[in-house]
From Swiss-Prot:
Any GO BP annotation: urea catabolic process
Compartments (UniProt record): Cytoplasm
One Pfam family here: cobW
Protein name (record): Urease accessory protein UreG
Subunit text: Homodimer. UreD, UreF and UreG form a complex that acts as a GTP-hydrolysis-dependent molecular chaperone, activating the urease apoprotein by helping to assemble the nickel containing metallocenter of UreC. The UreE protein probably delivers the nickel.
One Gene Ontology cellular component annotation held by this UniProt entry: cytoplasm
Family: Belongs to the SIMIBI class G3E GTPase family. UreG subfamily.
Listed NCBIfam families: ureG (TIGR00101)
The keyword Transmembrane helix belongs to this UniProt entry's keyword annotation: no
Entry's Gene Ontology molecular function annotations: GTP binding; GTPase activity; nickel cation binding
Function: Facilitates the functional incorporation of the urease nickel metallocenter. This process requires GTP hydrolysis, probably effectuated by UreG.
InterPro entries in the record: CobW/HypB/UreG_nucleotide-bd, P-loop_NTPase, UreG
CDD domains given in the database record: UreG (cd05540)
Length: 204
């Protein structure tokens, strides 16, 4: 049995689908694992409220952190506010298996502190254009898993998934990535399998 929960950081630009992915992961994993969530917003608890409204988990299992500044700082340079939220959840629910830490929307240079996250998932979306993987940055190149979301929008924005696939392979140098559409569940099974495999999770 794990003495400490697996902490999975979910990052990405504003509007890429981080909260939708967090919701989908909660719904997929909550019956198998002892699970909790920390969300980050600059001035509100909007993402936490969204998860509560959509019954992702019991409200007491979701903590919304108001960072009050650059969301990057709260997950990297000074992660204390998030670490305190993680500690609070551990005290509230002894024996947690998994804590999802969703960052506030940020730029392509955002990364999680190793003190806060054991695995990182970075979410980008097709509506930003097929050139996005080529722009690189730590999230695209170095995250443990890259999720390319909203693939259904590719025809609407003139984005080539084939080009995104080849560019992403080149930029990630063998690291895994998944194409997804959280509205329909495409890619979710692969993301769940990645978390379980890389996080060494064993369902009760």
């Amino acid at each position: 049995m794990n003495t400490q929960p697996l902490r999975v950081g979910i990052g990405g630009p504003v509007g890429s689908g981080k909260t939708a992915l967090t919701l989908a992961l909660c719904l997929a994993l909550r019956d198998r694992y002892n699970l909790a969530v920390v969300t980050n917003d600059i001035y509100t608890r909007e993402d936490a409220d969204f998860l509560v409204r959509n019954q992702a988990l019991a409200p007491e299992r979701i903590i919304g952190v108001e960072t009050g500044g650059c969301p990057h700082t709260a997950i990297r340079e000074d992660a204390s506010i998030n670490l305190e939220a993680v500690d609070q959840l551990n005290r509230r629910f002894p024996g947690l298996d998994l804590i999802l830490v969703e960052s506030g929307g940020d730029n392509l240079s955002a990364t999680f502190s190793p003190e806060l996250s054991d695995l990182t998932i970075y979410v980008i979306d097709v509506s930003a254009g097929d050139k996005l993987p080529r722009k690189g940055g730590p999230g695209i190149c170095k995250s443990d898993l890259l999720v390319i979301n909203k693939i259904d929008l590719a025809p609407l924005v003139g984005a080539s998934l084939e080009l995104m696939n080849s560019d992403t392979q080149r930029m990630r140098n063998g690291k895994p990535f998944v194409f997804s559409n959280q509205k329909t569940g495409v890619g979710l099974e692969e993301i769940v399998a990645f978390i379980e495999r890389q996080g060494l999770l064993t369902a009760a």
